[in-house]
């Protein structure tokens, strides 16, 4: 069930991304939305954040206090992570209502954590530029994959309690 749902969701997502391919460089809707929400969160911490479309790729430039810090690309929008999460949950399908509610709640949590991690990364890079690689390579993935792992553990626990004799 995992592989099948993962392949179907990934195919649908890739078809969605194909819809946004054009000669004009501008990211897909979700990537743009994540960039806008990250900008708002960073700004709420009294930083002057702004996003601008990248001139030569499908991404948004993230600028904090007039310093270009990062690109927000399609891989930053958490959709691929949500697909991975959903595929795992569906491979342990429980009662329909419970499974769908958990999928929705998990997707919202992952999406929100993704916005938070982008804000942490941007502020961290701005304040501690010498730690850019560490923040992006270790802390950044740890936040999102740690969240997914915890959600998976919770789901397996719920599922196993519902199916124990």
Where do the model's predicted regions map?
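Hydrophobic N-terminal alpha-helices or hydrophobic patches in metabolic proteins across all domains
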Residues: 1-165
